[in-house]
From Swiss-Prot:
It comes from the Bacteria. This is Endoglucanase G. Residues 489-650 form the CBM3 domain. It comes from Ruminiclostridium cellulolyticum (strain ATCC 35319 / DSM 5812 / JCM 6584 / H10) (Clostridium cellulolyticum). Belongs to the glycosyl hydrolase 9 (cellulase E) family. Coiled coil: none annotated. One of its GO terms (molecular function) is cellulase activity. GO terms for biological process: cellulose catabolic process. Residues 658-724 form the Dockerin domain. SMART domains: CBM_3. Keywords: Carbohydrate metabolism, Cellulose degradation, Glycosidase, Hydrolase, Polysaccharide degradation, Signal. The gene is celCCG. Its EC number is 3.2.1.4. The lineage of its organism: Bacteria, Bacillati, Bacillota, Clostridia, Eubacteriales.
Amino acid sequence: MLKTKRKLTKAIGVALSISILSSLVSFIPQTNTYAAGTYNYGEALQKSIMFYEFQRSGDLPADKRDNWRDDSGMKDGSDVGVDLTGGWYDAGDHVKFNLPMSYTSAMLAWSLYEDKDAYDKSGQTKYIMDGIKWANDYFIKCNPTPGVYYYQVGDGGKDHSWWGPAEVMQMERPSFKVDASKPGSAVCASTAASLASAAVVFKSSDPTYAEKCISHAKNLFDMADKAKSDAGYTAASGYYSSSSFYDDLSWAAVWLYLATNDSTYLDKAESYVPNWGKEQQTDIIAYKWGQCWDDVHYGAELLLAKLTNKQLYKDSIEMNLDFWTTGVNGTRVSYTPKGLAWLFQWGSLRHATTQAFLAGVYAEWEGCTPSKVSVYKDFLKSQIDYALGSTGRSFVVGYGVNPPQHPHHRTAHGSWTDQMTSPTYHRHTIYGALVGGPDNADGYTDEINNYVNNEIACDYNAGFTGALAKMYKHSGGDPIPNFKAIEKITNDEVIIKAGLNSTGPNYTEIKAVVYNQTGWPARVTDKISFKYFMDLSEIVAAGIDPLSLVTSSNYSEGKNTKVSGVLPWDVSNNVYYVNVDLTGENIYPGGQSACRREVQFRIAAPQGTTYWNPKNDFSYDGLPTTSTVNTVTNIPVYDNGVKVFGNEPAGGSENPDPEILYGDVNSDKNVDALDFAALKKYLLGGTSSIDVKAADTYKDGNIDAIDMATLKKYLLGTITQLPQG
């Protein structure tokens, strides 16, 4: 992925705006303004907000609504001794870039500020507020002391060189900061805007949190205002370089004014206006681009128009919206043949839907020129309908007709081999994600390597979410009741492949390879073992003690591999097994070597004997007779003692392991309500930090709701012994 090409700068914008302007040979598609909904805007809004749950980094909450994401980035900030866990991953990668992240959070807060009734009615207020708080909790961590701000976690180059799920990242994730000696005005001001806008929407429900946000917003704004420099903002270069900071300062100051009612901030916001970008060789405030992470003066001028009613801001925002709709002095943004207002190849839908949100906000204000109200509202509807399917296909993952199936997103893809081509399908549906969008001729290919048109990102959904709230408010649609992204597991998460490495008159040598291809969620396994079962009737008939057979291993990819001697399973039927223990080996779905461990082991009768017969062995059945391995099911695999793959022969011990404290899910040597909470979190979506063997309170080899019910009965005193079953 050439993420560098997602970078937008005003310099590029000026150059491109010249090439994309077109004569007004046609007008934007006419619609019946806010007619009965063409699409289910409620469902689209619901899923667009859910998208941000899939982007979360850090310690995920117990009430999460999926079963394929888990804690990740839990060491973020450890290199500088600061807890920098949390926040959102930027796009289809795992870097946390605070400039676009803070822009995104502020845009979501703006939408909630404008249309809280729509969120209340649709039942989405909790979810959008959770998302806004998730981002801003992280920003507060990034400002551990006044004058210091960590603006990025992760190295773009190292991050982009690996293709795998966030939960099993192994690369170093450096932290980068700005301060007085190395300033970053744009990112500090942008984050101040996010925190201040969060304070606005949390003021009534959580005034203490709102005040905390204001405190950090003021600190970051002061840093940005005093420095007026981006000289220290270097780590994001080539990804999210900033072309200016005065727009961010105005944006932040407006939100601080709304949060504090301190007119000093309103004055500050206006004081930066002369430094905003201008159209080439004019004194006209730039209008031939759109609201985005690198240029927020459009949002600032719209809010200033509403707050001050000054003609300067009204004229400027209307020129911008006219450029996107009817045109200005004979020029306007390009339109595709099917009606998308097309600004730029990277995130074309992001730009169109964000401008649609601004158009919707402004059209509802009484200060909007009356003759333009319907034009702006029509624009809002046409652009959102394009994204939702007016061309015959949806551009939103998990929504509508023919939605994208292969977005450029590592964790949603779920590769265990560090390859975007394996598997050939996406294991997860990242609901609500708006893909980049078509080219200027409506062309679009739904391919995972198409990072230009098919990547997804936090900022792509920001204005889109706000526009959907507008459409829901006016045209309705029903969110899906109790919607969750609980997926059916579509493949065995841990498997074993084996073959016959070598054989002789007195021995069998097995080549076995264990694979971790977990995805619900992806996780590191370090307690894997497997059993090779044998029918040793011929050994017993020869008068030999089966336990005297010799086992050995001449090759293992793991440093911690332990091959047991022959152990009894069902003595009455002469069934025995060898246990191969890989405890201590970190096997994870992160590469062709990382996801597997190979072991070659031998079971031998005494030298010179000829009674050895492997063909009646349970685990020999289905085993390839060459060293070319294939998946086998009669060599069961265990994770921390719990069978996760394959079959066992009949028999075996039915007695509980006396060393296991059943019900002690969190391994604190007690069985109490904390264990119930830990098991509930595991079942709601997954955490790998439980003792799965102790959690099997019903003793059926599965961890499920039956175990939770059994544990509950035990805690309530209905039953007095664990395990049951």
